[in-house]
């Protein structure tokens, strides 16, 4: 188990570094003589036609609606595995991170609403600071090396998992356009076939992908965000191969997708969405209630919500601190959870459709994430060093 966790954290750390480089590259290109090339790249028309079916979108939409569906598919696979055999399979293990995640989503939203209450047209962005980017958060935590207790890493991952569940529900419930009942019906008709494949222990991925693609197209046309098709499809991938119990179709697929998602899809998403032109930008734009509310939600709301819920649950006797940790370290993790980059950018696109005249929500996302990441790293670096000196050691998962 220790080796699996170590491999996972190393993978996420590397992915976080590549993600950061892609975001930096996007900002450099967007503020260089290559700006026009960047704009033409993300807005280049891409048309796919199969018979009478025509899907015409620009590259930006194909990345956000198409490639990100693969990311959400991987998220769905991870959620299913964690619920069946992982950290979420034991109710005693999930109370604290679940409560922390709820607090860490409600408080940032309230902070954002407080800054934008007098502007109803801006309230659509309330969910932007509610998200946590696990790749960046784990990447930052991994910079501290072996001093970090594995229980603290697991706590952070568990919060991020519940955060993903919350983000998926938010997108499904609050960021949908006018619904097409016919498209929803077609998407719904795929579910019995997927269920039948699962019950018959079909382990080949091709039949699932066939119905998954049909469902994705139907959901795309329905008004619900198409990436949710990826989550739904993941729930039907079998965890166990009854003919070969040593191999898990779900875990094999999860392993195969990790590299593609971490080192191709997410960096491409970051490159296509983080290209903020700073020409003409100043404190006035940064202090606009939308980006400022997002930054405050990520930095202030996240830590307040997570710490308040964690403290309340522990004081109520419903849970205890993760082994080998203390409240200072939990506070450091709450700061890292303010790194909302990927999912925040994604929800921002749904809420405002990109850059809006007079403000750019991405400024708040990047500023809030940077401040949260640096503050979390500095605090954990100091507290873990202090705790190591007083004899607190990392949890040994090999026992």
Swiss-Prot record:
It catalyses: Na(+)(in) + 2 H(+)(out) = Na(+)(out) + 2 H(+)(in). It is a multi-pass membrane protein. GO terms for molecular function: sodium:proton antiporter activity. InterPro entries: Na/H_antiporter_dom_sf (IPR023171), NhaA (IPR004670). It holds the Pfam family Na_H_antiport_1. The chain crosses the membrane at residues 14-34, 59-79, 94-114, 123-143, 154-174, 177-197, 204-224, 261-281, 294-314, 335-355, 359-379. Keywords: Antiport, Cell inner membrane, Cell membrane, Ion transport, Membrane, Sodium, Sodium transport, Transmembrane, Transmembrane helix, Transport. It is found in: Cell inner membrane. It comes from the Bacteria. One of its GO terms (cellular component) is plasma membrane. GO terms for biological process: regulation of pH. Belongs to the NhaA Na(+)/H(+) (TC 2.A.33) antiporter family. Na(+)/H(+) antiporter that extrudes sodium in exchange for external protons. This is Na(+)/H(+) antiporter NhaA. It comes from Psychrobacter sp. (strain PRwf-1). The lineage of its organism: Bacteria, Pseudomonadati, Pseudomonadota, Gammaproteobacteria, Moraxellales.
